[in-house]
From Swiss-Prot:
Key word Transferase present: no
SUPFAM superfamilies recorded: Ribosomal protein S2
Molecular functions per Gene Ontology: structural constituent of ribosome
Region (Disordered): 240-260
Transmembrane portions of the chain: none
GO process annotations (BP): translation
Sorted UniProt keywords: Ribonucleoprotein, Ribosomal protein
Record bears the keyword Glycoprotein: no
Listed name of the protein: Small ribosomal subunit protein uS2
Recorded family membership: Belongs to the universal ribosomal protein uS2 family.
Annotated InterPro entries: Ribosomal_uS2 (IPR001865), Ribosomal_uS2_bac/mit/plastid (IPR005706), Ribosomal_uS2_flav_dom_sf (IPR023591)
Species assigned in the record: Phytoplasma australiense
One term under GO cellular component: cytosolic small ribosomal subunit
Length: 260
């Protein structure tokens, strides 16, 4: 049974690539045509690649592997957090801190500090401290939570990295490749597919497109862990809100204007 329908891919705008002036020739085989100066991705190939990624990711999780979801663009932060939590995996949805993978032992120390700060507050230690010091501790805790909250239970390196926006997250991808961590990624028409082990050619800017693909990846993790993944009909792209953009007269349809 297919994990996504062609209709869902179209409704979510996964087929809208970047401007024909901003493209990577290595993505040529995934491009169907161009329209109004925008490359249109072949959703048949997107569907095929989704199936490949789904099966491999399910296998990794079934064998006890963990997956790190990564997407730091403001409009997709919620989707990354919600779907990773739904499938019980890890996530980074704000700035990628250099060394999260390649310098993990140092990151673990920061994570431990985060746990210590939470425990101090829960145990009432902060109540005995001056207000000024408590404010500083809360500020430190909140900052750590913002950047490391999604991986605070990650005790070892993940076996797979799922990325939204390969170009923006290139530092994280480089770290994963250096450690032979498998990289799964939405790859838009301006990106280099050779950097990825499992490519999903798709629009990585539109909220609905990212939500759909991230939802599918989460389903793969759920199925791999022995759970019951949601069926395609349970996803409704129309319920995913569009980003609020400033009014522009004579603009193109939404999916074509969110591109860089």
């Amino acid at each position: 049974m297919a994990v996504v329908t062609m209709k869902q891919l179209l409704e979510s705008g996964t087929n809208f690539g970047h401007s024909t002036r901003k493209w990577n020739p290595k993505m040529k085989k995934y491009i169907f045509t161009s329209r109004n100066g925008i490359h249109i991705i072949d959703i048949k190939k997107t569907s095929e690649k989704i199936e490949e990624a789904y099966q491999e990711l399910s296998k990794i999780v079934n064998q006890g592997g963990k997956v790190l979801f990564l997407g730091t663009k403001k409009q997709i932060q919620t989707s990354i957090m919600e779907e990773s939590k739904r499938c019980g995996q890890y996530y980074v949805n704000h700035r990628w801190l250099g060394g999260i993978l390649t310098n993990f032992h140092t990151i673990l120390k920061r994570i431990q500090l985060l746990h210590d700060l939470h425990k101090q507050e829960e145990d009432g230690v902060w109540k005995k401290l001056p207000k000024k010091e408590v404010v500083q501790l809360k500020r430190k805790r909140d900052k750590l939570e913002k950047f490391l909250g999604g991986i605070k239970d990650m005790k070892e390196l993940p076996q797979a990295l799922f990325v939204v926006d390969l170009e923006k997250e290139k530092n994280a991808v480089a770290e994963a490749r250096k450690l032979n961590i498998k990289v799964f990624s939405m790859v838009d028409t301006n990106c280099d597919p050779d950097l990825v082990d499992y490519i999903i050619p798709a629009n990585d800017d539109a909220i609905r497109s990212v939500k759909l693909i991230t939802w599918i990846i989460a389903n793969a993790c759920i199925e791999g862990s022995g759970g019951v993944a949601e069926k395609p009909e349970q996803f409704d792209a129309k319920n995913v809100l569009k980003p609020k953009l400033p009014y522009q007269p004579n603009r193109r349809p939404y999916q074509e204007t969110v591109k860089k």
